[in-house]
Every structure is written in structure tokens, then in C-alpha cells.
């Protein structure tokens, strides 16, 4: 008598029962240990995070060179905080007494290296104090000093109708750090909550979503443990935005891989009573697409190592570590959990050979989609391509040339409010001068050229002998600064040019670009730095990165697809449709951001969106086309394409919704970069999994026919 389940009989002759129990037990215990060790590092990760722009610039950038020299001129690694006090009318004697008392209180705070005298404005309606803060320690220490400084300002007795705020580079740094505070709390809660709701709707089971979420969290714990260890050893540099992207990427990717494996496991349970054989079948069916898709994402991410910006360079390996742990968890922990729980995981409706947990393939939504693509393939791909192309036209509204530092934080920002007060009563660059290092012999020539330049309010030279730390130039013989001498370090002096415009404005950037020409003309060895120059160098490096890395990512992913699918035509088809999807997401995203009043974006936003959308978009196409290729080899091209679409439709769309939801969760962090990235990537993933993967790719594959697989032997098969 022949058994209806030969795999069950072969199981009895194969791996012994004790080993089938031991393997999942060891895997589960191993992951529990990794999660137990990695979990506590969540709270420690912020201690190795840096959000200082200058630390991410290439060493050859002028602003980086100047930043490295500043401690030698100023005596310490310091960052200025500017306390500005203003009123609608002239400050009275009582208010000025309060400002003097505030200056004395600030000078006594731990972490405050030095304070300037109170500097009243020309209109008499404002006063400012520059406090130099110790920036040699972790960023959290600096943030703590700013918080104490703000507490002193809040408690100061300045009188009625007087406004006060802490701004300047230290103020903006503290505001950005505060914006990132929720990154390991509310961000994870929102992302995991959204994923859990989606999984409950997909599986209609209370237990299976918990197993999938545990897999994702375990993968994240291991990734954080590895990244924290490398950052502690100064092998990696971590920023707040990289930390947020790591969290979201691991949760989304690990859940996606879990969805793919679970679909194969459920399908196998409908064909055999044996959980062990179902596990082996699911691993055979899911390992190749999961490893291939994850490997493609890793390859795309590692292209960021070619970036000039250290922040971009480090995102590549950090995110690649996250994808690697997601693959590992999806192919070890989840199979072990599902093997242990078996059909109970799918309760209340568990698949069995007598009652498979699947509908007939020609029924339901994906049966209808497959019939539409089958009957109207040409119309489907033409209409879909036109819709996507129309959306891509929104790219003309894209403004990816940089964002003022005052706009980095979405919502309330005391530093931004303080900068507005400062600009209303003082030159906009007060407290945040452009720093120019020149040979001592060129001091007078460069200082004169700077003073004559348009957009410069005044020029000073750094001096340890001066009570204010600098000497205004040219020196007035009758002034108290006349006896002070400039600080000379290795034959160089530090000039400080105060700009008329706010240091993060477009006007200031234009002035500093012109000042660099002025300085280089007056001194061959002169270099220009400071906050505005740092922003210029960062934006310029980001634009160079975009022009270099995008083509390289396309070439790398093309080669991977050709090797995986053994087809040049299929690889180019998938890549072209994914790039079209990216263009649509970028265009529609630009229109949405313009409507929201935040059209300007950092140049790295389109680059990051490209890497994620192209790599992840190809990810979903790999899920589809590996199954299609498998089916084409068995039942021919046309039937294989349609069956691949039907059987993968639900799982891939669910995976896309999960990833879109996790990236959308980045929007809860009030940082403009992350909000814009969240909108564009979430849009792109939804577009890719609903329109591109479900309609455009299958319809084009039917239109092209077996030539889709050229030059492999599948290209010579029947239609």
C-alpha cells in the first residue's frame, strides 16, 4: 500500500526524533541569550551617538581642517551657546540688572568654560551673552549643560514683556539631541504596534504575530549588540539618524522575511502532517529568495562606503549588519519557533493536508488580478507605466539643496526662536562667526579683504590676552584691546568674520562661498570654516555622493539580478521598473512635502531613499521572480508568470505594507530628515508592492514572453 505522504515515511528513516527536538531548542535558546545580552544595550546606544556635522565631513574638507585647529586657538574644544534677551521696547535698568545677574549665574555653571560680557544691541532692545561650553565629552554632557543653562534663563528675573532664549551652535545641538530622545522608546513602540496590528489582520491568529514580532525584536537586539560593540571600539561612528534607520530597517526587513517563510511553511503544512518535513520544505522554498533579496539590499547599502561623508559611510555597514541579523533570524529563529509550535501557531484555523489554509488559486483578489493581467497585459502595463510616469513628473518640484540648521527640528525649537530674536537686533552671524585660519604674515591682508567683502559685519582675531577672547580689527589704539596680541599657533592666526545674515541662511552660504575666493586670493594657505562653511561642505559632499553612488548601486544590483535569475533581460526589466517606482515616489513625495510647507531637503534624502527603495524594491521583485522562475520551469512561461503572481500576491503585498508602516513610523521623531525619508520610502514601498510588482512586472513579462529569460534556456521554452 502506498502512503499518501511519502515525506512522512522518509522522515522516520531520516533525522532521529531527539535531534529534531534538540536543533530548534538550541536555536531558540541561542537567540534568547542574544536578545538577553543585546536588549540592555538599547539604553546604552545613545552614549556612542554623535550628531556633530563636522565629525562626519571628510578630513580634506576646509571646515574639518579649521575645526581641528580651533582648540589650539581657543584653548579647549568649545561650542558657543548664545543667550539672547529682547523686548519690544528699550530694556530698562531693572532688566539690564537681571541680565548682568544671569551672566554671573551662567559663568558659575559646570561645563561653562567662559562667558562674554553682556553685549547690548544698538537699538537698546536686546542683550546677548555668549557662553563657551565644554564640548570635549559625549554629546549628552553638552546637552545637559544647555538644559541647565536654559533653566537659569527661565528662572532669571528679567521683568515683564522680556523674552529670552538659548540659541547658537550649542542650542541647536541640544534641540536636535532632544528630538532624538524618543528614538529608542516611542519610535520602537509605534513601529512594533503598527506591525502587530497588520500581522493580526493578515494572519487572523493571536499567536503567530507574536512569534513574528519576537523574531524581529531578537534580530534587532543582536544588531544593536554588534553595532554598539563596534561603535564603542571606534570602528563605527553612529548618528541619531543612523540609529533610527537601523531600528526601522531591522523590524521591517525581519518581518518581511518572516512573512515569506511563514507563507511557505503554511503551504507545506497543507501537504504533510509532519512539522519537520514542512520546515525542510519551507526552508528549501524560502532560503534562496530571502538570502538573495537580503544580499541585494546589503550590496546596495555597502555602496554607501564610497561616500565622502562619514555619516553616509557608516550607515552602509550599520544597516547591512541589521539586514544580516534579519536574514539570520528569519531562517533560524522563526523556523525553530514554528517547528516547536507547529499548527498551534496558526490557531484558530490551522492548515492540514485535509484542510489546507489556502483558497483555490483562481479565487480571491489575486486570482482576479492574475485574470486581468492575463487578458489585458498590454493595456495593464501601458496604463500603469503612464500613471507612474505622471507621478514622477513631481520631481521637478524637488528642492534637495540643503536645509537650514534652524529647520532640522520639526515643531518647537528654542534655538530657532532665539536665532530669530538675535537676527532682529544683531547681525545674524553674531556668536557663530565664520572662522578663517591664515599664516600670521597674511593677517592684515586677509582681514582687510574680509572687512571689505559684502555681507560681512565685522572682523576680529582670536586672542588669549583679550577678555572677550578676540580683538576687533582694525585695532583702535585708544581701545582696551590695543595692548592685546593675537594668538599665534604654528605661525597661524584665527580670524573671525561675523556675517550680516543668519549663519544657516542661503544668503550666508553665498557670502561664505565668496569669502573663500577672497581668502584664497589674499593667502594661498588660508582655509575657511565655521558653521556656515560646515553646512556648505556637507551639502557639496552629499551632492557628489548622489552623483557617484546612484550609478554604482544600479550596476551592482544589475549584476546580482543577472546572476540570480540567470537572465540579462529579466534583470534589466526588474531594475527599470524599480527605478521608475523610485522616480514616482520621489515625485509624489516632493509634491506632498511642498504642500506641507517643507519642500527643502537635505541632498542625502534622495540618495538614502534611492538606496532603500531600489534595493528593497528589487527585494520584492526577487520574491516574485524566483517563484515565477520556479513555476515557469514546470508549467511554461505564461502559466508560470500568472501562478507566481497568484501565490505570492498576498504575502508580498503584506510585506510591503509592513515595511511601509515601519518606515512611516520614522515620522514620529521630530527631525525633518527622518520625516521626509519616511514619507518618500513609505510611498515608494507601497507603489512598488501594489502597482509595480502586482501589475507592471507580470504584464511586461507576458508581453515580452519567454524572451524575458534571455539568454537562459527558459527563454527558449513555450509561451
Give the positions of each predicted feature.
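Membrane-embedded transmembrane helical bundles of large multi-pass transporters/channels
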Residues: 1-49, 112, 137-400, 523, ...
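N-terminal extramembrane/targeting module of integral membrane proteins
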Residues: 32, 56, 87-90, 365
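Structured non-transmembrane domains adjacent to transmembrane bundles in polytopic membrane proteins
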Residues: 50, 57-81, 88-173, 399-600, ...
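Charged, low-complexity surface segments at secondary-structure and domain boundaries
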Residues: 54, 353-357, 405-407
Amino acid at each position: 500500500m502506498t502512503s499518501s505522504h511519502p515525506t512522512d515515511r522518509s522522515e522516520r528513516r531520516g533525522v532521529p526524533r531527539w535531534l529534531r527536538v534538540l536543533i530548534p531548542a538550541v536555536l531558540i535558546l541561542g537567540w534568547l541569550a542574544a536578545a538577553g545580552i543585546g536588549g540592555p544595550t538599547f539604553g546604552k546606544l545613545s552614549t556612542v551617538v554623535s550628531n556633530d556635522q563636522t565629525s562626519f565631513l571628510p578630513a580634506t574638507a576646509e571646515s574639518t581642517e579649521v575645526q581641528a585647529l580651533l582648540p589650539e586657538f581657543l584653548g579647549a574644544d568649545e561650542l558657543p551657546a548664545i543667550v539672547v534677551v529682547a523686548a519690544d521696547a528699550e530694556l530698562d535698568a531693572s532688566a539690564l540688572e537681571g541680565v548682568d545677574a544671569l551672566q554671573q549665574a551662567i559663568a558659575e555653571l559646570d561645563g561653562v568654560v567662559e562667558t562674554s560680557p553682556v553685549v547690548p544691541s544698538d537699538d537698546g532692545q536686546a542683550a546677548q551673552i555668549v557662553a563657551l561650553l565644554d564640548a570635549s565629552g559625549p554629546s549628552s554632557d553638552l546637552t545637559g549643560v544647555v538644559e541647565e543653562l536654559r533653566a537659569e534663563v527661565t528662572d532669571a528675573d528679567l521683568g515683564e514683556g522680556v523674552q529670552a532664549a538659548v540659541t547658537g551652535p550649542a542650542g541647536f545641538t541640544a534641540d536636535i539631541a532632544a528630538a532624538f530622545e524618543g528614538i529608542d522608546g516611542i519610535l520602537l513602540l509605534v513601529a512594533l504596534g503598527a506591525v502587530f496590528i497588520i500581522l493580526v489582520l493578515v494572519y487572523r491568529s493571536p499567536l503567530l504575530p507574536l512569534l513574528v514580532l519576537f523574531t524581529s525584536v531578537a534580530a534587532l537586539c543582536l544588531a544593536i549588540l554588534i553595532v554598539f560593540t563596534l561603535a564603542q571600539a571606534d570602528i563605527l561612528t553612529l548618528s541619531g539618524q543612523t540609529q533610527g534607520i537601523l531600528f526601522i530597517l531591522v523590524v521591517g526587513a525581519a518581518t518581511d522575511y518572516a512573512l515569506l517563510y511563514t507563507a511557505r511553511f503554511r503551504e507545506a503544512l497543507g501537504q504533510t502532517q509532519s512539522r519537520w518535513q514542512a520546515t525542510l520544505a519551507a526552508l528549501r522554498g524560502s532560503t534562496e529568495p530571502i538570502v538573495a533579496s537580503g544580499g541585494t539590499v546589503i550590496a546596495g547599502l555597502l555602496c554607501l562606503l564610497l561616500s565622502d561623508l562619514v555619516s553616509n559611510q557608516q550607515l552602509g555597514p550599520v544597516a547591512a549588519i541589521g539586514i544580516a541579523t534579519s536574514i539570520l533570524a528569519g531562517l533560524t529563529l522563526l523556523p525553530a519557533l514554528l517547528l516547536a509550535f507547529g499548527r498551534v501557531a496558526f490557531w484558530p484555523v490551522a492548515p492540514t493536508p485535509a484542510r489546507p489554509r489556502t483558497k483555490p488559486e483562481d479565487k480571491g483578489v489575486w486570482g482576479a488580478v492574475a485574470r486581468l493581467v492575463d487578458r489585458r497585459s498590454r493595456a495593464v502595463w501601458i496604463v500603469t507605466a503612464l500613471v507612474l510616469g505622471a507621478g514622477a513628473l513631481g520631481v521637478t518640484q524637488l528642492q534637495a539643496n540643503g536645509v537650514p540648521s534652524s529647520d532640522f527640528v520639526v515643531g518647537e525649537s528654542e534655538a530657532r526662536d532665539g536665532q530669530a530674536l538675535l537676527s532682529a537686533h544683531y547681525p545674524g552671524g553674531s556668536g557663530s562667526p565664520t572662522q578663517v585660519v591664515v599664516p600670521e604674515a597674511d593677517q592684515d591682508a586677509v582681514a582687510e579683504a574680509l572687512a571689505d567683502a559684502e555681507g560681512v559685519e565685522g572682523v576680529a582675531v582670536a586672542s588669549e590676552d583679550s577678555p572677550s577672547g578676540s580683538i576687533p580689527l582694525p585695532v583702535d589704539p585708544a581701545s582696551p584691546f590695543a595692548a592685546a596680541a593675537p594668538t599665534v599657533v604654528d605661525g597661524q592666526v584665527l580670524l573671525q568674520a561675523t556675517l550680516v545674515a543668519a549663519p544657516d541662511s542661503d544668503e550666508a552660504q553665498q557670502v561664505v562661498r565668496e569669502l573663500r575666493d577672497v581668502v584664497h586670493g589674499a593667502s594661498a594657505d588660508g582655509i575657511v570654516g565655521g558653521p556656515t562653511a560646515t553646512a556648505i561642505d556637507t551639502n557639496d559632499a552629499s551632492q557628489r555622493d548622489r552623483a557617484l553612488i546612484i550609478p554604482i548601486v544600479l550596476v551592482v544590483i544589475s549584476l546580482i539580478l543577472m546572476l540570480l535569475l540567470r537572465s540579462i533581460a529579466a534583470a534589466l526589466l526588474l531594475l527599470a521598473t524599480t527605478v521608475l517606482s523610485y522616480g514616482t515616489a520621489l515625485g509624489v513625495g516632493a509634491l506632498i512635502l511642498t504642500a506641507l510647507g517643507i519642500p527643502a531637503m537635505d541632498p542625502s534624502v534622495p540618495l538614502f531613499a534611492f538606496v532603500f527603495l531600489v534595493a528593497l524594491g528589487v527585494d520584492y521583485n526577487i520574491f516574485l521572480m524566483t517563484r515565477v522562475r520556479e513555476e515557469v520551469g514546470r508549467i511554461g512561461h505564461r502559466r508560470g508568470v500568472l501562478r507566481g503572481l497568484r501565490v505570492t500576491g498576498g504575502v508580498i503585498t503584506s510585506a510591503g505594507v509592513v515595511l511601509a508602516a515601519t518606515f512611516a513610523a520614522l515620522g514620529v521623531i521630530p527631525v525633518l530628515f527622518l520625516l521626509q525619508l519616511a514619507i518618500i520610502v513609505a510611498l515608494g514601498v507601497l507603489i512598488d508592492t501594489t502597482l509595480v510588482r502586482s501589475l507592471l512586472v507580470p504584464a511586461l513579462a507576458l508581453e515580452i514572453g519567454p524572451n524575458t529569460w534571455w539568454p537562459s534556456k527558459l527563454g527558449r521554452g513555450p509561451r
